[in-house]
Amino acid sequence: MIEGVMKEGFITTSYDSVVNWAKTGSLWPMTFGLACCAVEMMHAAAARYDIGRFGSEVFRASPRQSDLMIVAGTLCNKMAPAMRKVYDQMSEPRWVISMGSCANGGGYYHYSYSVVRGCDRIVPVDVYVPGCPPTAEALIYGIIQLQQKIRRTHTIARV
């Protein structure tokens, strides 16, 4: 992040680096727990793993207060429009983590008539966390991967 430090105590860096650093340390997730993966998501937020160390301290109930949606579980056809509506209500910039094989591709219920075969058919997904259910460590690794992806984005358009 820091390109140079002068003797007087000044730090020189780019605006993009500062803004992206701030974004990575203040992810406000909104839980979209649909099945058993949500239990592992709660486990990741508990005292043992404490995702607050990575800037995801408080799970928000309102989409207007969150910038990260964690989709955890099986998405059915009737729930898909509601999920899209919640995603559209989130403020920009917004990110999505697909957690578990059911959210990634339908999981065990892939061939069911009522299951969406991956939440990426409804909302754009930034990070996929595999597993059935994925462990809390896997979710934390997914959050770290998302933070690295955010650091690589450009806030200001280059001409």
UniProtKB/Swiss-Prot annotation:
Instruction: Enumerate the UniProt keywords alphabetically.
Output: 4Fe-4S, Cell inner membrane, Cell membrane, Iron, Iron-sulfur, Membrane, Metal-binding, NAD, Quinone, Translocase, Transport, Ubiquinone
Look up the record and name the cofactor or cofactors this protein needs: [4Fe-4S] cluster
What's the superkingdom here? Bacteria
Predominant subcellular localization, coarse grouping:
membrane
Record note on cofactor: Binds 1 [4Fe-4S] cluster.
- Recorded GO CC terms: plasma membrane; respiratory chain complex I
Give me the reactions it catalyses: a quinone + NADH + 5 H(+)(in) = a quinol + NAD(+) + 4 H(+)(out)
Q: Where in the cell is it found?
A: Cell inner membrane
Q: Name one GO biological process term.
A: electron transport coupled proton transport
Recorded GO MF terms: 4 iron, 4 sulfur cluster binding; iron ion binding; NADH dehydrogenase (ubiquinone) activity; NADH:ubiquinone reductase (non-electrogenic) activity; quinone binding
**Matching PROSITE patterns, A to Z?**
COMPLEX1_20K
Q: What does this protein do?
A: NDH-1 shuttles electrons from NADH, via FMN and iron-sulfur (Fe-S) centers, to quinones in the respiratory chain. Couples the redox reaction to proton translocation (for every two electrons transferred, four hydrogen ions are translocated across the cytoplasmic membrane), and thus conserves the redox energy in a proton gradient.
Task: Tell me what this protein is called.
Answer: NADH-quinone oxidoreductase subunit B
Source organism (scientific name): Delftia acidovorans (strain DSM 14801 / SPH-1)
